[in-house]
A protein has these predicted regions:
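N-terminal Rossmann NAD(P)H-binding glycine-rich loop of SDR-like oxidoreductase domains
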Residues: 20-41
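Conserved glycine-rich Rossmann-like NAD(P)H-binding loop of the short-chain dehydrogenase/reductase
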Residues: 43-53
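NAD(P)H-binding glycine-rich loop region in Rossmannoid oxidoreductase-like domains
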Residues: 64, 68-111, 120-123, 140
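Conserved Rossmann-fold NAD(P)-dependent oxidoreductase catalytic core, especially the SDR/UDP-sugar
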Residues: 89, 115-162, 188
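Short-chain dehydrogenase/reductase
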Residues: 107-111, 161-173, 203-211, 239-240
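Flexible, glycine-rich beta-alpha linker
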Residues: 137-139, 164, 188-210, 236-237
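Active-site Tyr-X1-5-Lys
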Residues: 160-193, 212-223
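Alpha-helical substrate-binding/gating segment
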Residues: 181, 195-198, 210-228, 238-257
Length: 257
């Protein structure tokens, strides 16, 4: 383990193609795309971990080490992070608005993942740590006006996050901020807004709005139904991000100083 004093004064060397990159939630949509992104850039040591059995992973990248691990368990996080230079935590129990409204306890339990992963990354001597947060961390009062303005990072406070899922994200963000301030582990946080694209979930309740709308339109055409059901009245403004832009942004935010 690198000492706290050394962490605080040491300048990071450039990430080598042989440095170990660990991706929690690598069997999921964004995690799998991130593994492919780094593989395509020529990184030779990539380890991904996910609680889903391997046949259920969204995509598997040739040459990437794949571990079937439940990262809400501390020892599994230690195993996943061993030897890591950079750790990306995209593991979470989450889905679309229907899922996070119905299964708040499951969403809240994801705080265990970040608690154990960031500590395991720190103990393993990782230089940098990424956490995938969400727009649900923002104050819900900002979502009442259909003429919504672009949000700043500071708009999450005063805090009134989405119940369950949003609060889990906000407190996990605080973990990241304090690990950097107190222990010198460089952390980066991104609040995702409706990421979509190839290999994304499109049914089962965990899908986001773009995939859900596409599925409903196709089903309506197949069944001959003239209408589909959507949430809300169509007036709120929504933000969407394509998966390629998302993983590029993760890479950039982790490696900008």
């Amino acid at each position: 383990m690198i000492t706290e004093t050394k962490r605080l004064i040491e300048k990071d060397p450039k990430l080598s193609k042989d440095d170990l990159i660990v991706i929690g939630g690598g069997g999921g949509f964004i995690g799998g795309a991130l593994a492919r992104h780094f593989s395509d850039k020529g990184f030779r040591r990539i380890r991904v971990a996910d609680k889903k059995p391997l046949p259920e992973w969204y995509q598997r990248v040739p040459g990437v080490e794949c571990l079937h691990l439940d990262l809400s368990i501390e020892d599994n996080c230690k195993r996943a992070c061993e030897g890591a230079v950079e750790v990306y935590n995209l593991a979470a129990d989450m889905g679309g608005m229907g899922f996070i409204e119905r299964f708040r306890v499951e969403c809240l339990r994801s705080v265990l993942i970040n608690t154990h992963m960031i500590e395991a990354a720190y103990r393993a001597g990782a230089r940098r740590y990424f956490y995938s947060s969400s727009a649900c961390a923002y104050n819900t009062n900002l979502q009442q006006d259909p003429e919504v303005r672009a949000l700043k990072e500071s708009d999450a406070y005063p805090a009134m996050a989405e119940r369950g899922y949003g609060w889990e994200k906000l407190i996990s963000e605080m973990f990241c901020e304090e690990y950097w301030a107190e222990r010198g582990l460089k952390t980066a946080i991104a609040r995702f807004h409706n990421v979509y694209g190839p290999w994304g979930t499109w049914d089962g309740g965990r899908e986001k709005a773009p995939a859900a709308i596409c599925r409903k339109v196709i089903a309506a055409i197949d069944t001959g139904k003239p209408t589909i059901t959507i949430w809300g009245d169509g007036t709120p403004t929504r933000s969407f991000m394509y998966i390629d832009d998302c993983v590029k942004g993760i890479d950039m935010i982790m490696h900008c100083d």
